[in-house]
Amino acid sequence: MSVFAASFEPYGAGQKAPIGALAPATIKARLVAYKRNVAKRYRIVAPDQISDRIPEGNLYISTKVDGELWFLVKLQGEVAFCSPTGRVIVGIPACIEAEKQLSGEGDIIVAGELFAVVPKG
């Protein structure tokens, strides 16, 4: 049994739970609030528009990749990718690596863009 969802189905090397499956209501509320209050303000700006469209001051920037907003969540020692729609992914290599890297740390939520790199060929 996971702290994230009641049931999962196989998903590659891990497991996934469908839309609405994310169990902790407080976590889901935080993910939805982040999407509503922060992610909706993300902007794509061409280099020649930076001085016109971006306000002065301290800013956080990142490269846009064609992914989806997901969160890496560590809760009660378990690590999962969780979406604002309530989907959950556990047990994939990225989750296992994150669990190793975050060992000894408390609960955490990290916003990011989930995407897959397709091997050339």
Label for each model-derived stretch:
Residues 1-19:
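Intrinsically disordered, low-structural-confidence terminal and linker regions
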Residues 14-76:
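RNA/tRNA-interacting regions in translation and RNA-turnover enzymes
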